[in-house]
Amino acid sequence: IRDRNIDSWHLFGGSWGSTLALIYAIKNPSKVKSMTLRGIFLCRKFELLWFYQYGASEIFPDEFEKYISVIPQNERENLIASFYKYLTSQDIELRSRAAAAWTNWELSTSHLIKRDFNVGKSKTNSFSDAFARIECHYFINNIFLEDDFILKNVNIIESIPTRIIQGRYDVVCP
């Protein structure tokens, strides 16, 4: 983009993409003409707890049981930390099971009607391993930003035209 002398552009992002778009806009407000964001995810602690620890578990209890089944009962107080431990384990089988559980949980809850092609992705070791490890790594490290970074800096982007689209049944990014 910089090689093509594009000075500013429109951002579009959904879920994690909305997080990245907002962070980019805060760090580079003069380069953003507008934003269209769907499924807003600010990566706040309570959003992570809602989805990975409690909350969404009440809506999808059967899928949540599959998700937590790879974590021993005595290690479930902080599921993100426990998953991080298993996702970074040297034990490849343990790591693969944790990655499949993490990925299946997210893909099973990200659509109103369960999609077989999504569930199939969670059974692909290379996809699940990369998806779960990258996502969990960012979450365990607070996406490498201070708490509530986006909300604390929203004044920087208040003049950027922004459209927000939010789904009624969005469980991942309520």
Residue ranges and their predicted role:
Residues 137-154:
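Active-site nucleophile elbow and catalytic-triad environment of alpha/beta-hydrolase enzymes
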Residues 1-10:
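Conserved acidic catalytic loop of the alpha/beta-hydrolase fold
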Residues 18-29, 35:
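Short glycine-enriched nucleophile-adjacent loop
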Residues 157-158, 164-166:
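Short beta-strand/loop motif that positions the catalytic acidic residue
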Residues 9, 13-15, 167:
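Conserved alpha/beta-hydrolase "nucleophile elbow" surrounding the catalytic nucleophile
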Residues 146, 171-174:
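Conserved alpha/beta-hydrolase "acid-adjacent" motif
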Residues 30-83:
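A catalytic-pocket lid/entrance helix-loop region that shapes and gates access to the active site
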